[in-house]
């Protein structure tokens, strides 16, 4: 899976976290493991230009998705197994997202993770134009984000336990411990 991030926003953002959450969602949604995704972080002026050009709406927005192919959620059961493909581009505006995060009372990193999940779901054919679509997409978005955070917590616990076990085994003489 190839995920490219280009930060042109002028803001310091954890590209590793964006890649992590995008990779998690793509895997969880059973997208081909060789799929490609591009993410671009832009400033408010650039996002406002894109928003006007593609949506005919004034001002910046938080996230826009540009799929390479029109996909539908779930696909068809009788269709052949899809091969690797370019999913498309996600454009994020960290400065706009920062304002949203402040209003929501959570960190910018959380807002960007949420918007990344949202953008990937749009690339996979999900939409929220109708109430039922919104309910489905936002429910899935929140579940995926919650699952990603749980996955991160589990990985941190596992790493802490592995470090503790290595230290104990080193003290017991099973192998050289870093603190000996």
Curated annotation (Swiss-Prot):
Q: What is its EC number?
A: 3.1.-.-
Principal place of residence: cytoplasm
- InterPro entries the UniProt entry points to: MetalPrtase_cat_dom_sf_prd, YbeY, YbeY_CS
Q: Which UniProt keywords apply?
A: Cytoplasm, Endonuclease, Hydrolase, Metal-binding, Nuclease, Ribosome biogenesis, rRNA processing, Zinc
> What GO molecular function terms would the record report?
metalloendopeptidase activity; RNA endonuclease activity; zinc ion binding
Q: Cofactor stoichiometry and binding?
A: Binds 1 zinc ion.
Which named protein is this? Endoribonuclease YbeY
Q: Which Gene3D superfamilies match?
A: Metalloproteases ('zincins'), catalytic domain
Q: Which Pfam families match?
A: YbeY (PF02130)
- Entry GO terms, CC: cytoplasm
Q: Which family does it belong to?
A: Belongs to the endoribonuclease YbeY family.
Asked if Zinc is a keyword of the record, the answer is yes
Q: Which NCBIfam families match?
A: rRNA maturation RNase YbeY
Its job: Single strand-specific metallo-endoribonuclease involved in late-stage 70S ribosome quality control and in maturation of the 3' terminus of the 16S rRNA.
PANTHER family per record: ENDORIBONUCLEASE YBEY, CHLOROPLASTIC
Q: Which domain of life is it from?
A: Bacteria
Enumerate the residues binding Zn(2+): 118, 122, 128
Where is this chain's protein located in or outside the cell? Cytoplasm
Give the source species.
Rhodococcus jostii (strain RHA1)
Q: Which cofactor does it need?
A: Zn(2+)
SUPFAM superfamilies, A to Z: Metalloproteases ('zincins'), catalytic domain (SSF55486)
- Transmembrane regions: none
Question: GO terms for biological process?
Answer: rRNA processing
């Amino acid at each position: 899976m190839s995920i490219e991030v280009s930060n042109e926003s002028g803001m310091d953002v954890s590209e590793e976290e964006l890649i992590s959450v995008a990779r998690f969602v793509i895997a969880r949604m059973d997208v081909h493991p060789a799929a490609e995704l591009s993410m671009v972080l832009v400033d408010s002026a650039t996002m406002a230009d894109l928003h006007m050009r593609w949506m005919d709406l004034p001002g910046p927005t938080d996230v826009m998705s540009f799929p390479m192919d029109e996909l539908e959620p779930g696909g068809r059961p009788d269709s052949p197994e899809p091969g690797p493909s370019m999913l498309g581009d996600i454009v994020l505006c960290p400065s706009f997202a920062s304002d949203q995060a402040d209003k929501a009372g959570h960190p910018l990193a959380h807002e960007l993770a949420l918007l990344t999940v949202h953008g990937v779901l749009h690339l996979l054919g999900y939409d929220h134009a109708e109430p039922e679509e919104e309910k489905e997409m936002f429910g899935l978005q929140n579940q995926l984000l919650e699952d990603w955070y749980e996955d991160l917590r589990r990985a941190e616990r596992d790493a802490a336990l592995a470090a503790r076990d290595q230290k104990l085994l080193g003290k017991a003489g099973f192998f050289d411990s870093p603190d000996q």
